[in-house]
């Protein structure tokens, strides 16, 4: 069954005991919120309270893990002298964005799931959606800048101009300036923020049929989905190509020296290109699975591709918020120097006792970037 097709109404009934008659998912919405509700949602019966309970529990767990994980990344990178480098400023910014996203969005969602509707009023609805858009956009473009930094270091090599603290801060300021711009447009009439789905969350209005509103979704998707995704794919494609060419040169050099490999015996079985290809595939795949459900839902709304159910919007929310949980693992904990600092400050929480070359590659050669910046 398609994500956006008409849902199975067993998801909205009391354990199959007859349904709700003429009740709808909108019935519990506060009177002052009704002018924000699209007529589309009145066709759906109330959701089974178990779904609200499950959603609240999962969002609460994701929020706790994300706040702790990203908080530790910020603390370790900020207090460890060897990690305070230009490239790692981007990693800290990503952790900062994800930290604030879940800190600001998880508690309201849990509260609303408890009451089975949005109970915090119109202003908080707008603020909730605004913060979700702000931190989501900030995280997306920070990941783009990290990919471009790795491309600059690995593909261009010595010919590349190393990133300094000043250029890193300028990029971060640019990220937040652009994110704020995209976030405030709906407050001035280009689209708007409204309750959606099971009425426990708010987001952009993708059901409005006016082209002024639709145009915001289209332009926003270009600059906050398609362009970032294309840039990340482009960067990692050429990174893998560059590492592959380097591996080929190493094999040829080893052949001339009449040795099996220039690598240590420990790493001889797995080439750097294979490891980095896996990392690139993982990075792109996680990004794709985090944000694509929202894009599909938004486009389904503005182009009327199918009937969007409240249940579908739940999955969109979960996938996007899960991104804030695994980002600290992909971009922070995989960094060998980070793990060494973690082992020193929190021995019981350390992921590994010793950093290794594989982990260094898993961090996307950030260490190489750091050393190059330091030598500039």
From Swiss-Prot:
Quote the biased-composition stretches of kind Polar residues, using this chain's numbering.
Answer: 358-368
Q: Which residues span the membrane? A: 52-76, 89-113, 129-148, 168-191, 216-243, 279-302, 310-334
What is a biological process (GO) this protein takes part in? phototransduction
Bilayer topology: Multi-pass membrane protein
Q: Where, per UniProt, does this protein localize? A: Membrane
Q: Where is this region: Disordered?
A: 353-376
Q: Which residues carry this modification: N6-(retinylidene)lysine?
A: 321
**What kind of modification does the protein receive after translation?**
Phosphorylated on some or all of the serine and threonine residues present in the C-terminal region.
Q: Which CDD domains match?
A: 7tmA_photoreceptors_insect
Record-given protein name: Rhodopsin
Species of origin reads Sphodromantis sp.
The upper taxonomy is:
Eukaryota, Metazoa, Ecdysozoa, Arthropoda, Hexapoda
